């Protein structure tokens, strides 16, 4: 299965009638493995900031999480495993696997819990596959 298939079928799938607005699978070095057509263009330093927060949880909390120039307020995640952010009625979930970052961005009517479930389910599967 291609990485694009994972994005299209597992991240952009419908969940209770809702779906993510954009999603991507990105290598921990910032290379894009696959992404939705409307995934924001991000800067390398934004991925570096995310990776630094996984290494030392809490580093993004004072400044916020940036992706594609959009600032998200960092909310409760799972140290070294999941970073969650909120911006208005939407937000972002980032799950770290052995080799990649699974990123889902949502807006209403999708809920944070639905986004978390979609992103983390795929991330957990990839971890089980040693990816």
Swiss-Prot record:
Compartment list: Cytoplasm, Cytoskeleton
Assigned GO CC terms: cell cortex; cytoskeleton
Keyword Translocase in annotation: no
Statement: the UniProt record of this protein carries the keyword Cytoplasm: yes
GO molecular function: actin monomer binding
PROSITE patterns: PROFILIN (PS00414)
The entry's keywords: Actin-binding, Allergen, Cytoplasm, Cytoskeleton
SUPFAM superfamilies: Profilin (actin-binding protein)
Chief place where the protein resides: cytoplasm
SMART domains the UniProt entry points to: PROF
Protein role: Binds to actin and affects the structure of the cytoskeleton. At high concentrations, profilin prevents the polymerization of actin, whereas it enhances it at low concentrations. By binding to PIP2, it inhibits the formation of IP3 and DG.
Sequence similarity: Belongs to the profilin family.
Record's subunit section: Occurs in many kinds of cells as a complex with monomeric actin in a 1:1 ratio.
Protein name: Profilin-2
Organism field: Solanum lycopersicum (Tomato)
């Amino acid at each position: 299965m291609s990485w694009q298939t994972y994005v299209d079928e597992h991240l952009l799938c419908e969940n209770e009638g809702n779906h993510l607005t954009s999603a991507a699978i990105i290598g921990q070095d910032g290379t894009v493995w696959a992404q939705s057509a409307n995934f924001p263009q991000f800067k390398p330093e934004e991925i570096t900031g995310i990776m630094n927060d996984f290494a030392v949880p809490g580093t993004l909390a004072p400044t916020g999480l940036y992706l594609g120039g959009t600032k998200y307020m960092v909310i409760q995640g799972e140290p070294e495993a999941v970073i969650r952010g909120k911006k208005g009625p939407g937000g972002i979930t980032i799950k770290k696997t052995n080799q990649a970052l699974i990123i889902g961005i949502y807006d209403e009517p999708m809920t944070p819990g639905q986004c978390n479930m979609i992103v983390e389910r795929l991330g957990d599967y990839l971890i089980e596959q040693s990816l």
